[in-house]
Amino acid sequence: CAVTFWELSSWRSGQKALWKYRLALAAVIAPLVVYKIGAVFDQNLMGFLGISYITFKAIQVIIEIRDYLIEDMNFTDYLYFLVFFTPFTSGPIDRSRRFTEDANRRYTASEYADLLARGIMLLLVGAVYQKVLGTVFHHYFTPAPLGDGPWWQELGAQVKDAYMYGFYLFFDFAGYSLMAMGASYCFGIKTPRNFRVPFLALDVRDFWDRWHMTLSGWFREYVYIPL
């Protein structure tokens, strides 16, 4: 938080030094790097739940300050954006300006009732995805060891396992994302959708445009396009 507001105050005062921008980025990325290095060596040097997503959010804000997309920001709004708990562990990754607009919006009773109803529906659908469908596919995903049977039987078993595991991953992850969306809606935050029927994709690129969309969009906006 401190380095982000230090960069913001520098940009507002006209002190647009590139080294400050780079230092701010390094400061927010460093804890994640230390945590990942510790994980490799099985040492919990510096880690906590949701550190990756907090890092992505902080990087996003710093880049948008540099690009003049954010000219002013309330400290409370920024902290709320970073630690908003419903998508804390696995996303979806929201955008700070969109999130802040929702957080500061005053809903009428009827508007909030509609939002709450949609949130509850998303929670229920997400629970079915994760707890029912995900469990079913996980139960039937039984990796078959390679044996001495005919090659086509072995190949068929491996293909079946690959499909079962793919569907299990989808329903487990998409179910969590839907529940995170639903809980967010109940708090008045319209967290964006994370999956859009990826198994109906026409090619590999289309698949990744439909799978974990907020993460792929984040990399596209803040990594690939700037490079």
Tell what function each PLM region has:
Residues 1-227:
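Membrane-embedded transmembrane alpha-helical bundles that form the catalytic cores
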